[in-house]
């Protein structure tokens, strides 16, 4: 999966369990510290999970459009973010919360696992997508300890401290990454 990447991405894989036959959707993230800000799961148009609704006409139309206009990772960041809302949800691995599953035109099947968790407050593409589809935008990183921040047009992608994140609160990003990866590994 990662053999075609330029450079190396450090991160972890997280399994999200769907409400469809408890099917797992595996995501790869370089920012596990932002998991408490996840408001959606986005999968590639050709992700295996799409088999469960492949005969739905609206999905077929979306998939055709998305695959026709799909390009490289860098060109995807410039394109309009489009999504198809599936009828399914996943359970957040650390909260009693359901997260919607979307098929998105900015996710590539051959990059990572072909699925991401969207954290709109801290990723610009996720923010554009969340605004378009009225999804929650919850900041979980702040430049100052214990201080909330407001996200408007630009995601906060700088260094800082974790907020709104239960057992990760007040940790640095690096310390939070280590702690959340340990918790994820314990759940396996």
Positions of PLM-derived features:
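Short, flexible, solvent-exposed loop/turn segments with mixed acidic/basic and small polar residues
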Residues: 30-32, 103-109, 152-155
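Extended, domain-scale alpha-helical bundle/helix-rich regions
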Residues: 14-49
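Amphipathic alpha-helical
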Residues: 1-10, 38, 43-85
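Short glycine/proline-enriched turns and hinge-like loops at secondary-structure junctions
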Residues: 37, 111-113, 131
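Structured DNA-binding interfaces in DNA transaction proteins
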Residues: 84, 102, 140-143
């Amino acid at each position: 999966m990662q053999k075609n990447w330029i450079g190396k991405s450090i991160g972890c894989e997280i399994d999200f369990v769907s409400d469809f036959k408890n099917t797992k959707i595996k995501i790869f993230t370089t920012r596990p510290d932002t998991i408490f800000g996840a408001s959606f799961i986005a999968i590639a148009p050709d992700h295996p999970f799409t088999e469960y609704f492949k005969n739905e006409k609206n999905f077929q139309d979306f998939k055709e459009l998305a695959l026709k206009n799909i390009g490289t990772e860098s060109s995807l960041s410039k394109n309009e973010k489009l999504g198809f809302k599936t009828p399914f949800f996943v359970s957040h691995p650390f909260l009693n919360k359901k997260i919607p599953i979307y098929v998105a035109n900015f996710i590539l099947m051959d990059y990572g696992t072909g699925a991401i968790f969207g954290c709109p407050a801290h990723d610009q593409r996720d923010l554009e997508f969340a605004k378009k589809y009225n999804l929650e935008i919850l900041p979980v990183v702040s430049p100052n300890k214990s201080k909330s921040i407001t996200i408007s047009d630009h995601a906060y992608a700088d260094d800082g401290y974790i907020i709104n994140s239960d057992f990760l609160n007040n940790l640095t990003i690096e310390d939070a990454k280590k702690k959340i990866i340990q918790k994820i590994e314990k759940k396996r």
